[in-house]
Amino acid sequence: MKLVKLSLVAALAAGAFSAANATPLEEAIKDVDVSGVLRYRYDTGNFDKNFVNNSNLNNSKQDHKYRAQVNFSAAIADNFKAFVQFDYNAADGGYGANGIKNDQKGLFVRQLYLTYTNEDVATSVIAGKQQLNLIWTDNAIDGLVGTGVKVVNNSIDGLTLAAFAVDSFMAAEQGADLLEHSNISTTSNQAPFKVDSVGNLYGAAAVGSYDLAGGQFNPQLWLAYWDQVAFFYAVDAAYSTTIFDGINWTLEGAYLGNSLDSELDDKTHANGNLFALKGSIEVNGWDASLGGLYYGDKEKASTVVIEDQGNLGSLLAGEEIFYTTGSRLNGDTGRNIFGYVTGGYTFNETVRVGADFVYGGTKTEAANHLGGGKKLEAVARVDYKYSPKLNFSAFYSYVNLDQGVNTNESADHSTVRLQALYKF
């Protein structure tokens, strides 16, 4: 009994001491920055009887998808900041036996890292669980997260230097978007690009931004080694300028390649290469672009990115054609050549109405030539910028696989997406 009393007294004393030394709430939150994203999507997709269902395309059935991220960044000591991101990701609705209902899904900690900044040498060290934001990974709100260290230096005007090391990845969040899972199943041993195991990822990058000949020149160089997978390299360069009076012109090109690790250098895998080029123009509310890309191997599985479509959105068009079998950037068998044109008009700098048209094909020597043939996609889209923080958008996409080795008749897939996006 005496021990219990002493323990209780000690606990009360410790509680009193803790309360006396607690940081007042007003002082605790004065250096905390809060930001985040709220996103709602309505998705529905339809496959005709000739189209083999592919989970990388939109197979939603009137699904309501919710995504919320809240970020807290706080200065915790001289030169140190802590960052935590809470994420909510759920989908409800649909019909049939596979209808979705997870409305009670909760928040989880998606990112958690510490940043040390030394202003004297313009260098930051970021350590912890963080979104990678590489050229080979998606840089949007659902990009690949890994645990590691990143060092960023800005001591040279117009040039950012970075080095990174990652020893684990949040693979479950990405599903079929992650390399080695890029097929209708998310089971790695059924993926076109098979990886028995993966090691650490090490890399470096140089990203520049320079005034050149009256325009803006933005070059990038990326190098990375993913143990037991491949040595990756990428070059991207974009030049923007104004010609004549009020005509904005941009030209961007990129090359992404890799050399496979010896463990994957066999008769089923090939080194990956991608060449992409795009030119765009804007004048008096009108915008248009013309581009094309070449990638893949017709006999063996290859990849050009690590996750989803990488950070190559500015060099692509359409919504779903680059997710079709044989054409996936994150691991597939097929040699692909595509060209595209986009255009649109923006009313009062708030509402844009536009369209994309992508046409090309895939040549493959895979079993039964799976994924091969001519392909096209047509997209109609509307975007409404209600305010700097709130945007509404919608698109309708139609994908067609021409009659060929995979279908006795042409196969169609269509999808509709409505979205509301708020950033704060």
UniProtKB/Swiss-Prot annotation:
Which gene is this protein's source?
Answer: porA
Q: Which GO terms describe its cellular component?
A: cell outer membrane; pore complex
Q: What does this protein do?
A: Assembles to form a functional porin. May be one of the structures responsible for adhesion to intestinal cells.
Compartments it resides in = Cell outer membrane
SUPFAM superfamilies associated with the record? Porins (SSF56935)
Q: Which domain of life, per UniProt?
A: Bacteria
BP-aspect Gene Ontology terms:
cell adhesion; monoatomic ion transport
Question: Where does the record locate the signal sequence feature?
Answer: 1-22
Its predominant location is membrane
Protein name per its UniProtKB record: Major outer membrane protein
Taxonomic placement: Bacteria, Pseudomonadati, Campylobacterota, Epsilonproteobacteria, Campylobacterales
Looking up InterPro entries in the UniProt record yields: Campylo_MOMP
Q: Write down the species.
A: Campylobacter jejuni subsp. jejuni serotype O:2 (strain ATCC 700819 / NCTC 11168)
Q: How does it assemble?
A: Homotrimer and monomer.
One Gene Ontology MF term: porin activity
Which keywords fit this entry according to its UniProt record?
Cell adhesion, Cell outer membrane, Ion transport, Membrane, Porin, Signal, Transmembrane, Transmembrane beta strand, Transport
Q: Does the keyword Phosphoprotein apply?
A: no
